[in-house]
Amino acid sequence: MRQHVNPLSQFFQLPLSLPSKNILFEKSHYPIHLDIGSAKGEFLIELATKYPDWNFVGLEIREPLVSLCEKKRRKLELTNLKFLFCNVNVSLDEWLSDLDFGQLKRVSIQFPDPWFKRKHFKRRVLNTNILNSIAKSMSKDGEIFIQSDILKLIEYMTNTIDENRYFTRKNVGDLRSIDKNPYDVMTDREIFSLKKNLLIYRVMYIRNSLLFTN
């Protein structure tokens, strides 16, 4: 399986109509935690098991991983969790518009593909359009949590969110002031990085009270 896929390739520019929350979940009114780039899904599987009164959605651009995650989820009979194949740059905004305002409580973006070359920066998952889609759906005090073991990438991500007026950084200054995953569950990459004694940079943003305007 390819580690990285180009989200700007023609195939991934085709918009997908994702299932609505009422189709995805038995209890569709529960608050939602959205994990962008859910990889092998262990992070969300553990969260969904621990917190049955939340709904969890994992979005992943690598379709074979989504199939693998869904197989695990069905085996565990987790009805508050779904993994969906999509390119968030193309399909996220429409799906979020189906949610009740404020239902989206948490968004996590953890160890995303770095795309190191400057000419490939536009392939990175986080951008102004995605942030605005999230801001439009999220009410005051909603969370965006990001983490990476690559300093240049976390700096790029924080700069991108800092420029967005709808989110306020919680841990200003030190990129290492959050010493563990705030959701008390680690991703596979997080576990790997800690075993290798790599530095992990974590930043939490809070949706402020500013009303969204186009």
Swiss-Prot record:
Presence of keyword Glycoprotein: no
Reactions catalysed according to its record: guanosine(46) in tRNA + S-adenosyl-L-methionine = N(7)-methylguanosine(46) in tRNA + S-adenosyl-L-homocysteine
One Gene Ontology MF term: tRNA (guanine(46)-N7)-methyltransferase activity
Highest taxon above the source species: Bacteria
Keywords: Methyltransferase, S-adenosyl-L-methionine, Transferase, tRNA processing
Positions contributing to S-adenosyl-L-methionine binding: 35, 60, 87, 113
Pfam families membership: Methyltransf_4
Annotated pathway: tRNA modification; N(7)-methylguanine-tRNA biosynthesis
Gene Ontology CC: one annotated term: tRNA methyltransferase complex
Record-listed E.C. numbers: 2.1.1.33
Binding residues annotated for substrate, in chain numbering: 117, 149
Gene3D superfamilies xrefs: Vaccinia Virus protein VP39
InterPro entries: SAM-dependent_MTases_sf, tRNA_(Gua-N-7)_MeTrfase_Trmb, tRNA_methyltr_TrmB_bact
Entry annotation: catalytic residues: 113
Enzyme kind, highest EC tier: transferase
SUPFAM superfamilies: S-adenosyl-L-methionine-dependent methyltransferases (SSF53335)
Function: Catalyzes the formation of N(7)-methylguanine at position 46 (m7G46) in tRNA.
Family: Belongs to the class I-like SAM-binding methyltransferase superfamily. TrmB family.
Record protein name field: tRNA (guanine-N(7)-)-methyltransferase
Annotated organism of origin: Prochlorococcus marinus (strain NATL1A)
Organism lineage: Bacteria, Bacillati, Cyanobacteriota, Cyanophyceae, Synechococcales
